[in-house]
Amino acid sequence: MGIRENGIMLVSRERERARRLENRESIFAEPPCLLLAHRISPSPSILPAEEEVMDVSARKSQKAGREKLRREKLNEHFVELGNVLDPERPKNDKATILTDTVQLLKELTSEVNKLKSEYTALTDESRELTQEKNDLREEKTSLKSDIENLNLQYQQRLRSMSPWGAAMDHTVMMAPPPSFPYPMPIAMPPGSIPMHPSMPSYTYFGNQNPSMIPAPCPTYMPYMPPNTVVEQQSVHIPQNPGNRSREPRAKVSRESRSEKAEDSNEVATQLELKTPGSTSDKDTLQRPEKTKRCKRNNNNNSIEESSHSSKCSSSPSVRDHSSSSSVAGGQKPDDAK
């Protein structure tokens, strides 16, 4: 039994060896004649020991190759880490590279956490700002509506208080009056101006209406502004030297107009005195001559004063006109007596 079992084991070993040899033809390059010889005449004492040695050597060589490849890859990775950390420094050992990478990772994680906290704070602040913005928009719309309501109430009050408020714009009514640095003329209606409403009608003038006498003055009467405007005019007049030459002409024209008005008033008073029923003709004729001389003296004095001053006004003509009307009015009760 023992011999038979040994024979079976040898046959099985030979078969396994044949299979291994067929699979490893590149490693164990043996000619086919030797293989046939081994198959025909196997040596059971020598072949198993050689096979075991070959298997162990092959395994060791494969393991060494794998280890070499793994170390080469690790070295490449360490070189890349060193270049990322500090490419200018020389090559360090693996321990320093690992410590530097660990420290850098810790710093990066702390920065990431800090940025996350800042992001959350900024998001909360942005929400608050958006809420405030919406509140301000609502307040703005409410204020606009209040302003519109107040404007409507103001317009309604203007229309109820003044009849012309409906036709005029409230912006025009609220605007301040313009200030002119010089006197502006006022437009008067064309026609005659009532001078002496108590005088009787005379056919000499050809006017049937006793209260209306043709006015010798033009249709525009000079407008006297307040004192502030006159002072502004006195400040602005020296800047224009051309106005000095125009002032005497205007004054002369105004004096001639006032003299014409005085002559017409004197003619009217003389005709009134020549009417029947007048007792003292000589006294009444002498009075207009005296008044005329006084008026001329007043005109000369006013011209001299105006030449020294820079103010431009039409007060002398208005005063002469008022004095002539007062003289004429003062003569009427004497004549009536």
From Swiss-Prot:
Main location as per UniProt: nucleus
Transmembrane segments: none
Record field: compositional bias (Low complexity): 297-317
Highest taxon, organism lineage: Eukaryota
bHLH domain mapped to chain residues: 58-108
Bias (Basic and acidic residues) ranges: 244-263, 280-291
Single GO term (MF): protein dimerization activity
Coiled-coil intervals, chain numbering: none
Self-association and partners: Homodimer.
UniProt protein name: Transcription factor bHLH121
Organism in which the protein naturally occurs: Arabidopsis thaliana
